[in-house]
A protein has these predicted regions:
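Short, acidic loop-to-helix structural element flanking the phosphoryl-transfer center
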Residues: 84-110, 144-155
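Substrate-recognition element of Asp-dependent hydrolases with the DxDx(T/V) motif
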Residues: 96-125, 138-140
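C-terminal cap/substrate-recognition subdomain and adjoining C-terminal extension
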Residues: 118-227
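Metal-dependent phosphoesterase signature
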Residues: 69-93
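Asp-based phosphoryl-transfer active-site loop
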Residues: 52-73, 169
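Loop/turn segments within WD40 beta-propeller blades
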Residues: 51-56, 103-106, 158
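Generic beta-sheet signal
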Residues: 58-60, 109, 164
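Non-catalytic pre-domain segments flanking phosphatase-related domains
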Residues: 1-62
Length: 227
């Protein structure tokens, strides 16, 4: 029983329950807070999608020898295949083809080797026989001699350098653009090697970064590494 003073509005408890129940149903049907959160979430997603559309594709540039393959003049283990030229035997690094297939729809893929043009083309008949993975091939004649060392000038790729990475086992390759470099352990034929699996994970982390140089500088600090 609700006590009332003079002039107060007297209510019935059962009517109060009905009124509160109706009010609660109204709130649940029209959850303005949730709608506002959903609207904000949708707007954020649209902005995110738009920013991703505006970004050029990430360009991934691979070195060849000791990064994707191992070559030797004599056959050292069963996985090696003789090149068509007959000059050497080549084995493809574990997970190489899988990596190329995974990132192909997401990235521009290029090859930048310090090997001769004829050698690189010969090796690519094993890695990419149908020409489906690599958008551009650069070889020794595109390298830059810096104090007697072959450096790779990524400006020659024609790609946006803020959205370009070079994966290479040789540190001197990064001399001209150190903050675009991703060092990888050289491969000499180990069957249990998983370096390219690690590269896949890193590439995926960089896919939507506006400036990969900032990330790679913090991660590797290649500017301070002596070659």
């Amino acid at each position: 029983m609700v006590s009332t003073s003079q002039g107060a509005y007297q209510t019935n408890p059962s009517e109060n329950k009905k009124a509160l129940s109706s009010l609660w149903e109204f709130v649940m049907r029209n959850d303005f807070t949730t709608k506002r959160k959903l609207d904000n979430s949708k707007q954020a997603k649209v902005k995110s999608d738009l920013s991703s559309v505006d970004l050029p594709k990430l360009t991934v540039v691979f070195d060849l020898d000791w990064t994707l393959i191992y070559a030797s003049k004599q056959k050292l283990f069963p996985a090696q295949q003789r090149l068509a030229s007959g000059k050497c035997f080549v084995a493809i690094r574990p997970h190489c083809i899988t990596l190329l297939k995974i990132i192909r729809p997401l990235c521009n893929i290029m090859m930048f080797s310090a090997g001769t043009e004829s050698y690189v083309k010969d090796v690519l008949t094993l890695i990419d026989p149908n020409g489906e993975y690599f958008d551009k091939i650069l070889s020794r004649n595109s390298c830059t001699n810096v104090h007697g060392m072959w450096a790779k000038d990524l400006a020659k790729t024609g790609a946006d350098l803020k959205r370009t990475v070079l994966i290479d086992d040789r540190r001197q390759s990064f001399l001209l653009q150190p903050n675009n470099g991703i060092p990888i352990r050289p491969w000499t034929g180990q069957e249990d090697d998983t370096e390219l699996v690690k590269m896949e994970k890193l590439i995926m982390e960089l896919i939507d970064e506006k400036n990969v140089c900032e990330i790679l500088k913090l991660k590797y600090n290649m500017e301070r590494i002596e070659v």
